[in-house]
Amino acid sequence: MDRIVEIEKYSLDETYETSLRPSNFDGYIGQESIKKNLNIFITAAKKRNECLDHILFSGPAGLGKTTLANIISYEMDANIKTTAAPMIEKSGDLAAILTNLSEGDILFIDEIHRLSPAIEEVLYPAMEDYRLDIIIGSGPAAQTIKIDLPKFTLIGATTRAGMLSNPLRDRFGMQFRLEFYKDSELALILQKAALKLNKTCEEKAALEIAKRSRSTPRIALRLLKRVRDFADVNDEEIITEKRANEALNSLGVNELGFDAMDLRYLELLTAAKQKPIGLASIAAALSEDENTIEDVIEPYLLANGYIERTAKGRIASTKSYSALKLNYEKTLFEE
């Protein structure tokens, strides 16, 4: 069963989410420092009539890395071609993408940390020298053919910057980490998005949805879509706090933004009574993939102090006990 607070992209939601994305920096809310610096770099590159240097965006899923890539394309008046690292299985796949680029194009690679070392080797000269080295044959008879590429900007996005090899990371001239959003920022995003959906969202309703969105715009917009359904069924043009609460409670998203999976995760850790639990054990207990736990469930819990990650495993913090209305002292020391 799909989680309403799932952060990964749903293919059916892509058209919906794209229609709500801002097209320029003026409409982009949050990440102020990143916006300010990008504006400067874009303006400078346009004055010099040059491509932007390569850019790496990192941070938890759903914070706007893809949106920023598209805004950069708009601000640079450049074409953008989008792909994801898992789709680039062979060096020939990457070569086909690179040779189809035009001067000044932007290539956006999502989940760039999942590129294989062999693919990275092809990417290095393309990023540094705008050159593609193709090896024909094998052994002593192997030959390298060098193909010049048009100047382009590579924008990479990753939820796991630590998994990037140092040579690849060092080839990005600009590196930015996106941070979780404040509730007030999410509320503004929601009110703007509601207008695009032909609804008016009251400020208190927007804040209520924001509070349950795990500080993540993608989740906030998905919840807004579901709350809108409740409003439509009741023939309401205005999304009220009461209707938002009703919808979110019905969806099983509590006041902290936790759903059933989050609660199962925290209950597992608190039941361990401060004994660390390894990732593999958690994945087995929850019947979830380890990557899903690390990329989807844990980032928000870690950032907000609900769990601690140690060398031996995960431990629930006192904040988790409070969230589950458990007595920390009793749970910690009872036999």
From Swiss-Prot:
Region (Head domain (RuvB-H)): 255-335
Region (Small ATPAse domain (RuvB-S)) location: 182-252
UniProt keyword list: ATP-binding, Cytoplasm, DNA damage, DNA recombination, DNA repair, DNA-binding, Hydrolase, Nucleotide-binding
Region (Large ATPase domain (RuvB-L)): 1-181
Annotated Mg(2+) binding sites: T66
Enzyme class: hydrolase
CDD domains on file: AAA (cd00009)
GO CC annotation: cytoplasm; Holliday junction resolvase complex
This protein's domain notes: Has 3 domains, the large (RuvB-L) and small ATPase (RuvB-S) domains and the C-terminal head (RuvB-H) domain. The head domain binds DNA, while the ATPase domains jointly bind ATP, ADP or are empty depending on the state of the subunit in the translocation cycle. During a single DNA translocation step the structure of each domain remains the same, but their relative positions change.
Entry's family note: Belongs to the RuvB family.
Entry protein name: Holliday junction branch migration complex subunit RuvB
Species the sequence originates in: Campylobacter jejuni subsp. doylei (strain ATCC BAA-1458 / RM4099 / 269.97)
UniProt gene name: ruvB
